[in-house]
């Protein structure tokens, strides 16, 4: 596949096109992803010695396996990962988190869900709801990926982060503000997910800005 894609895309300069091997690779054994990534990198390098290649971190049981990532070579390779933690907050209101409910109080920073409402969460999320999250806890998690990139001696790019529109607006803004501050502090480039159309969007279908505060946070205004 990547041999064919390289043949098609190599006409475009490196300044315009980079190749991400696979979006959000998932495997019960991260070694599988390391093997596949090495094969793909080798195939691309045989045709394009200097093309920028973006390699994602393998996810196992919803956990990013930063420490398991290996690279066969690091020339013009960039590491990427996505961050949606704590997922109970960022995916608030989904069937998979709150059972589709949006009437259970949730907040950030602080204990995510007040004690008196914990039992209203699906059992799998009750322990998460009892935990305390703030800028420090976000930073600790993000630094796992940032540190791994430093160990590999490659640049790092946070390709996605965001919260659902159903997340209460004050907490949503607080979370975005901390995320952007941490990434800027560590000089890590990033992309917010997403722009419009999906449940995470900040702009409506008619290009209207739905959440001006989030736009200001993301643009540094």
Range-by-range predicted roles:
Residues 1-2, 34-37, 172-178:
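Charged helix-capping and loop-helix junction motifs
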Residues 3-132, 143-163, 185-188:
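Active-site region of glycoside hydrolase catalytic domains
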Residues 5, 138-145, 176-180:
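Short, acidic/polar
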Residues 31, 136-139, 170:
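Soluble non-cytosolic domains of exported or imported proteins
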Residues 87-91, 112, 121, 136-137, ...:
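Generic alpha-helical secondary structure signal
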Residues 129, 140, 147, 213-221:
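Aromatic- and carboxylate-lined catalytic core of secreted/periplasmic carbohydrate-active enzymes
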Residues 167-221:
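Aromatic-rich peripheral "rim/lid" segments of glycoside hydrolase catalytic domains that contact
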């Amino acid at each position: 596949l990547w041999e064919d894609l390289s043949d098609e895309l190599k006409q475009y300069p490196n300044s315009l096109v980079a190749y991400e091997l696979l979006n959000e690779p998932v495997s019960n054994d991260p070694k599988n992803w390391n093997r596949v990534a090495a094969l793909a990198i080798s195939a691309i390098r045989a045709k394009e010695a200097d093309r920028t290649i973006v390699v994602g971190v393998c996810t196992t049981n919803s956990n990013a396996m930063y420490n398991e990532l290996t690279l066969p070579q690091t020339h013009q390779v960039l590491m990427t990962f996505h961050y949606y933690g704590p997922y109970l907050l960022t995916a608030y209101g989904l069937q998979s988190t709150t059972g589709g409910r949006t009437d259970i109080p949730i907040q950030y920073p602080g204990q995510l869900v007040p004690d008196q409402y914990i039992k209203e969460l699906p059992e799998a999320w009750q322990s998460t709801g009892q935990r305390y999250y703030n800028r420090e806890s976000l930073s600790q998690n993000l630094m796992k990926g940032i540190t791994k990139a430093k160990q590999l001696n490659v640049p790092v790019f946070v390709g996605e982060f965001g919260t659902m529109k159903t997340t209460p607006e004050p907490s949503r803004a607080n979370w975005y503000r901390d995320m952007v501050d941490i990434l800027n502090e560590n000089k890590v480039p990033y992309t917010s997910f997403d722009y419009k159309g999906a449940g995470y969007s900040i702009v409506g279908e008619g290009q209207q800005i739905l959440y001006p505060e989030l736009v200001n946070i993301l643009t540094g205004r």
